[in-house]
Amino acid sequence: MSAGSPKFTVSRIAALSLVSLWLAGCTSSSNPPAPVTSVDSGSSSNTNSGMLITPPPKMGATTQQTPQQAPQIQPVQRPVTQPMQTQPVTEQPVQMENGRIVYNRQYGNIPKGSYTGGSTYTVKKGDTLFYIAWITGNDFRDLAQRNSISAPYSLNVGQTLQVGNASGMPITGGNAITQADAAQQGVVTRSAQNSTVAVASQPTITYSEGSGEQSANKMLPNNKPAGTVVTAPVTAPTVSTTEPNASSTSTSAPISAWRWPTDGKVIENFGASEGGNKGIDIAGSKGQAIVATADGRVVYAGNALRGYGNLIIIKHNDDYLSAYAHNDTMLVREQQEVKAGQKIATMGSTGTSSTRLHFEIRYKGKSVNPLRYLPQR
């Protein structure tokens, strides 16, 4: 078959067609061509053979290196310094009683009426109405009434009080009873095993009458409670050392007769010696009636004087006072007029360790033996 024959030509065309179809099948591969980016982009390109081709870096270009992670540095913890705690300095020893601060001032060392600031006083930190009344020579209740201060007599720093001039006269000096004294007198102490405990002194309680009468101020000396030491001012203004008899009373409103304040056995007698009992103690039962020993006016009814519990003081005339301590209940109020034999209280054990009445009679501020005035029985 020659090259120019028609049969040869058809065979050649068929062969070329088969080759073309085969080539077309090879180029239609299912794998897409690998993306090729420009060399200028600095990226690598993949070839159909799967080889990774990395283009050479451009001239003058800086090769970037992956930064290495720096090691973490733990912060240094500095020690925390605690601020220095300073202990507050108190000007006066204090103690807590029923949730209130009680200042343990030694009033025996503070001159009464020593304030020289005029007719007004500005309250300072730590002041109490008792203290202000003491240094200004007033009765604390008169001072409270003058300045419209009600119980419990709270004051504010910077508050101005009208103090005026005091007319009451305090009783100075002091007596103290220890456990040894109590043992000699046969008193059963509440806690005999405890050592002697000092009791905060209280200011003298004064009673300014304001009507020309002598002051009825008579702060009672302490004869108890056993097991404690009480430093309450107790001596009176200078008077004759001779104890008066019942018949030597003042000519103003003389006392015709004295009554026993309650029934019962005298368990402690009057002691004239220093530190002795300044009255008599009468045993009884709780709730037992206590009556006024003579006509008079109640000048004090309260419990501000430690060691006496609920205390009533009656002024009978310019010379005589009577006092009734350790009451369970008080049935009279201050400035109330009472008659001899009138029930004024019930017996109790406030301020002491057993149920009793502590009874005192005072002549011009001096403690006298009540048995020399009371009728025999």
UniProtKB/Swiss-Prot annotation:
GO terms for molecular function: metalloendopeptidase activity. One of its GO terms (biological process) is cell division. Pfam families: LysM (PF01476), Peptidase_M23 (PF01551). Residues 203-250 are annotated as: 4 X 7 AA approximate repeats. This is Murein hydrolase activator NlpD. Sequence repeats lie at residues 203-209, 225-231, 237-243, 244-250. The lineage of its organism: Bacteria, Pseudomonadati, Pseudomonadota, Gammaproteobacteria, Enterobacterales. Residues 79-93 have a biased composition (Polar residues). Residues 1-25 form the signal peptide. Residues 119-163 form the LysM domain. Activator of the cell wall hydrolase AmiC. Required for septal murein cleavage and daughter cell separation during cell division. InterPro entries: Cell_wall_metabolism_enzyme, Dup_hybrid_motif, LysM_dom, LysM_dom_sf, Peptidase_M23. Residues 30-93 are annotated as: Disordered. A lipid is attached at C26 (S-diacylglycerol cysteine). It is found in: Cell inner membrane. One of its GO terms (cellular component) is cell division site. Belongs to the E.coli NlpD/Haemophilus LppB family. A lipid is attached at C26 (N-palmitoyl cysteine). It is a lipid-anchor. Its main location: membrane. It comes from Salmonella dublin. It comes from the Bacteria.
